[in-house]
Regions:
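Acidic, polar-rich low-complexity tracts and alpha-helical solenoid repeat scaffolds
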Residues: 1-383
Length: 383
């Protein structure tokens, strides 16, 4: 029928010229006038395309669905399924698409890999569009459905970012922890930096220490490795577990590139443990190493403990000289004040009551500042 063909070709030509509204109107007249035309499936498919380009997804789905129902084995049906898939994926409703494909008997075309890919694509589209809540829901569905999925790392990374955007710290930490456990990947450094920061701030020190330690292993810059190891030291110290502090100190000592701050703070912590365990000789050995630089609080404290050890061994002349030498090195104020208090005790031991009184008088003018906390969050190479 030439009239039939002409009517269809007119509508198709409009679509070819991207005159979609005119094309849709002509093709709708065509299928109404020629319901039994052999070109009906083609016209329905073209209508689905026209309305998709016009932004009317509901009408597009209607016509694509008509193609699949009336001519399921046709090439037009396969094209219609692609259009239907695109609409569902763009709306983040990939599971609805899978249900639809199963209902119309087209699920055989969906391999496990294509299902994986489509599910992630739908979630990613929502994430990139800034639809955080919808993206999080879709990403959670992907992670549950494809625990070994090809895009699992990407999904976990995007999901953790969604949680951070909405202030769900606990869920963010859980997701970041899962991603950190997937082995080294493109997100490892960023993930471990954020995970260590969040867990430290939340006083989850064991988790923070583990994250900092992993970060040291994966980061490639010198500064990054030093900061990571410093964080590892401080998180472990904040946790307060003596056995973990001992293991951490040994671990750091075995890594010369851990950085001066981490090496110093871990060595001092180990010396403190030894002193608490009455292993004074071993502690003093470490204190002597740290005492070489009194600009840091650890160095100032270590040098003072060396003075204290000399005093306790009974050599008052040596202790006196050492205290004056210590004062000339400009240690931190708290430990300098402690040293002058010790000097007064030296004079008492020596029977020099005049000097003892003079020292006591001078130290009343000294206000001893507090030492502060030994543990701080990671913040570069602080003294």
């Amino acid at each position: 029928d030439y009239v039939d063909a002409a009517s269809y070709e007119l509508g198709r030509s409009y679509i070819a010229q991207e005159r979609y509204a005119e094309g849709a109107g002509q093709l709708e007249r065509f299928i109404a006038d020629y319901p039994s035309s052999p070109r009906r499936a083609q016209a329905l498919a073209d209508l689905g395309l026209a309305y998709l380009n016009l932004g009317d997804k509901e009408k597009s789905l209607k016509y694509y669905d008509m193609v699949v129902e009336t001519a399921p084995q046709s090439s037009e049906a396969k094209g219609a399924m692609q259009g239907i898939r695109e609409i569902y994926v763009s709306d983040g409703k990939v599971d609805d698409y899978f249900d639809y494909a199963a209902r119309v008997g087209m699920e055989s075309d969906l391999t496990a890999m294509s299902r994986d890919s489509l599910s992630f694509a739908a979630a990613q589209k929502l994430y990139l569009a800034g639809q955080t809540d919808a993206a999080a829901k879709s990403l959670r569905s992907y992670v549950r459905s494809y625990p070994k999925g090809y895009y699992l790392n990407d999904a976990l990374y995007f999901l953790s970012d969604c949680y951070l955007r909405t202030g769900e710290r606990g869920d963010a930490i859980e997701t970041l922890t899962e991603l950190a456990g997937q082995g080294t990947n493109q997100y490892s450094v960023t993930v471990l930096e954020k995970l260590s920061e969040l867990t430290y701030e939340d006083k989850r020190y064991d988790e923070a220490a583990a994250a900092f330690r992993k970060l040291y292993d994966v980061t490639t810059t010198v500064a990054g490795r030093e900061d990571a190891m410093t964080g590892y030291v401080r998180a472990t110290l904040a946790g307060g577990d003596a056995s973990k502090i001992e293991a951490m100190a040994a671990d750091v000592a075995a890594h010369p590139d851990a950085g001066a701050v981490a090496l110093r703070e871990s060595k001092f912590a180990w010396a403190e443990l030894l002193r608490q365990q009455d292993r004074r000789a071993d502690a003093v050995k470490l204190y002597r190493e740290l005492a070489a630089d009194v600009r840091s609080k650890e160095g100032s404290a270590a040098a003072y403990y060396v003075l204290e050890d000399t005093f306790e061994k009974g050599d008052m002349d040596k202790t006196e000289k050492a205290i004056f030498a210590y004062s000339e090195r400009e240690p931190q104020a708290y430990w300098l004040a402690k040293a002058f208090i010790l000097l007064g005790d030296v004079y008492v031991r020596k029977g020099d009551n005049f000097q003892a009184r003079a020292t006591r008088a001078s130290r009343t003018a000294i206000r001893l500042p507090t030492t502060g906390s030994w543990t701080k969050p990671r913040n570069g190479s602080q003294n």
